[in-house]
Amino acid sequence: MNFNNLDFAAAILNVSLLWILTVPHEFAHAWVATLLGDDTPRREGRLTLYPLAHIDWIGTTLLPAITSLFGGGFIGWGKPVNTNPSKLRWGAKGLALVALAGPASNVVLAVILAGAALLAVRLVPAFSEYAARGVRLSLYLAIFNMLPVPPLDGSKLLLSAKVPYAVYAELARFGLILLLVLLTATSLGRWMSLWSYQATEQIFRTLHG
């Protein structure tokens, strides 16, 4: 193995950005679930912006660091927010809204970061570049989290669509392996990266006028 080819800068940047982006993402799940009548996130301490409440040490640190180091795509997620579907207003539709809240927050964050990057481009170029990277990563996470594979948000849409729980449980058993296969042995990872770059460019063009 040639350790000279390891991208330590990408690993540090991606993990630090993932920590920043994970907090509002998971908080959005907790907040929407609470609005819809489920007190589970509040009781479990997830209705907070405290970072460590939402960090999954494997999904938010270890895996993204490894995949960034070796340049093999990007895999990362936060600590899943537990919900009780029986307490949610509107039942399956409520569960779908909770699931969509996280990716939606990533899109909102991408727009905010893009605005910050444009404002800082002359005053603090280094921050502008960091924020622009955050835009791309936030949009990537929005679409990545929609994959219907546990523990990602898209898998909750399977439950809201009344997919048998036994099927969901089987997916959950092999979720990590399935994600690794999808992102390394297919063109899915490259497609998501391309989409996030194109969406980022579109946001910057729109904001810049």
Set out the residue ranges of the language-model regions.
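Hydrophobic transmembrane alpha-helices and their immediate loop junctions
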Residues: M1-G209
